[in-house]
Amino acid sequence: MSPAKKSRSFPPISECKSREYDSIAADLDGTLLLSRSSFPYFMLVAIEAGSLFRGLILLLSLPIVIIAYLFVSESLGIQILIFISFAGIKIKNIELVSRAVLTRFYAADVRKDSFEVFDKCKKRKVVVTANPIVMVEPFVKDYLGGDKVLGTEIEVNPKTMKATGFVKKPGVLVGDLKRLAILKEFGDDSPDLGLGDRTSDHDFMSICKEGYMVHETKSATTVPIESLKNRIIFHDGRLVQRPTPLNALIIYLWLPFGFMLSVFRVYFNLPLPERFVRYTYEILGIHLTIRGHRPPPPSPGKPGNLYVLNHRTALDPIIIAIALGRKITCVTYSVSRLSLMLSPIPAVALTRDRVADAARMRQLLEKGDLVICPEGTTCREPYLLRFSALFAELSDRIVPVAMNCKQGMFNGTTVRGVKFWDPYFFFMNPRPSYEATFLDRLPEEMTVNGGGKTPFEVANYVQKVIGGVLGFECTELTRKDKYLLLGGNDGKVESINKTKSME
């Protein structure tokens, strides 16, 4: 028989003494997170695991959700969000989105004062939330350092492994169900501390030895992302900003105009000579910044320069061609035939056979300049992945170029999505910008043939130089690391296609 509930009032978290606790139970929305609403995160699941159409249905249903939440029950409002966002989606896709997309948005929303209290707990940190466990568990464990999540469990069809849109018994974890979950988890040893932000949290806070309310205040701030338990290096998803109701409305109002603008930006510039495109970009609202000395084209009979870039989007080689004002060949992995056909510059697909690829690139360098991105994949955050050393074996005429871009509404890269649409999403941004900084050609003493350096030394040196210019941190992470985290595969074309065919 469970203990009777106690009627208590709780002091604000500002009165919580700076001391360590052995165990803590804390709510998520409005407590550990600054935002009290879980709508943006359900919207992300609806769009990224479902579709833009599902996201639109969720947005249009928001008035019904609010009415149900305020005038019927908190549980019903959340059930509606879950049904629209989850119904018919494979649970594996929801898990991938939770790990690859939601963590970045959750991490940017962590409330400083409550996280500091939560983090001081020495032994047992539990998050109790009305949100589905599948949504929040990767974030809570990997970035908050939580030990367990007590939340709503999603019902899954065992035959199709798709979410039904309903929840398992006892239902959405709110009010007294949170209290019962805490009692089941902790038994007679109640948590030392309970944190909540609303009246329905009083039920579980009342059985904690101490309880504090996290009130909504203008002075509340978020924790710097680098202060969390892990760094956010890789993330996926098309949306740049957290889709609050207002942001989501703006996105859907902009979508038809943005798509038409994107198509015009792509195909208007496609037939134009590269030396003119820089100016048409500015006219069409695309800001291009070019810095450093741009080498002239190679003289007849001489090998070309090897331009080595960090990789931000699939547009990197095209930006180099525009900056140089001439056609330039690029090599790439994981690109469709249609993308190769529509590319405004010559693009050669590599095979990941080291010997064959090296021979092919040497042939291309004999004919002219060549662009290569040795990271092998894009990275959105201010980090550089490990540079493959193959490029250092090909030429001593190496020109590093530091690339960066800004996107305000949509991300022009994806792991789980269709890569063909990457440039279109980039150009759907109202005012996208790109920066290319040409660095000095590598001195002879820093090359393989002229200076006796190993290919790995050259690759690490180029990575360090580019990272220094951009202010990015150099890492040893690879394409495989990124795709295993975000896509559940090793990043090879055949693996990606196999993963998608199973979805």
Curated annotation (Swiss-Prot):
The species this protein was found in: Arabidopsis thaliana (Mouse-ear cress)
GO molecular function, one term: phosphatase activity
UniProt name for this protein: Glycerol-3-phosphate 2-O-acyltransferase 4
Tissue specificity comment: Widely expressed at high level. Highly expressed in seedlings, developing seedlings and flower buds.
Motif range (HXXXXD motif): 311-316
Superkingdom of source: Eukaryota
Compartment(s): Membrane
Function: Esterifies acyl-group from acyl-ACP to the sn-2 position of glycerol-3-phosphate, a step in cutin biosynthesis.
